[in-house]
Amino acid sequence: MLHYKFHQSTKNSNDLIVLLHGFISDQSTFDEHIKTFTDEINVLTIDLPGHGFDQSSETSTWNFEFICQLLDDTLALFKAYRIFLHGYSMGGRIALYYALYGTCHLNGLILESSSPGIADEDDRIERIQIDQARAKVLEIAGLEIFVNDWEKLPLFQSQYNLNTETKRKIRQMRLQQNPVRLAKALRDYGTGQMPNLWPKISDIAIPTCIIVGSFDEKFIKIGYHMCDLIPETSLFEVKGSGHTVHVEEITEFDKIVLGFIFKEEQND
């Protein structure tokens, strides 16, 4: 079972949003959303393998099938709720996999800056090599050097515009992670290890919401491609945001998520 926190709604709501974070993060990345969400719905935040307070055994292989089973075990505790599964980046890849192979019924899927994997085999092998090299940096150079490099990636350039306190909190959260377990996470379920789900996503039979930032050209392209393939999909391009929409545009993110959930509630 995954480490989680349940945040009960102040209303008598049967809706539950499950929030899956990205790499070198944990469930605290969603702290700024809890108040707004619980004013309307219930929230479940989760620490994925190798992150936060997760206790997954390092002798296990943390592949997508393994994580899917852990998520099955966790969501089974909340099967009385209408479950909406959200995932950001790495968490979005897990959410996509779960939507196809998980056993607990989902009422909706929310994908933030996410991808169904790498279609080209040569590109996938190249990404595995990148993930393995980054894992070695974590193990040899240490967490602070890795975080310094991670913060400079073009993917996170728009985070430079965040206020000083927010940037401090993000950096502190990253530096609180365990470098050995992060390295294992990269090797076991990094982007390169994800099965290519592009041929499968047309089988997703639940309402799906795709969220991308207007500065994130790569994931805008991926998002629109997914939108063409998943039968019941809506896409939201958030102005003024990069890859981490839930961090960079908190109010707009909350509005999109709650709007999607309320719309599906009315359709049921």
Task: Tell me the role of every PLM-derived stretch.
Residues 217-222:
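Conserved alpha/beta-hydrolase "acid-adjacent" motif
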Residues 5-56:
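Conserved HGGG/HGGXW glycine-rich cap/lid loop of the alpha/beta-hydrolase fold
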Residues 122-125, 137-200:
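Conserved alpha/beta-hydrolase catalytic His-Asp/Glu region
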Residues 100, 107-139:
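Flexible "cap/lid" loop of the alpha/beta hydrolase fold
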Residues 241-250, 254:
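Catalytic histidine-centered segment of alpha/beta-hydrolase-like enzymes
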Residues 44-86, 255:
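Active-site loop/oxyanion-hole signature of alpha/beta-hydrolase fold enzymes
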Residues 204, 210-212:
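Short beta-strand/loop motif that positions the catalytic acidic residue
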Residues 87-91, 95:
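Gly/Ala-rich beta-loop-alpha elbow adjacent to hydrolase catalytic centers
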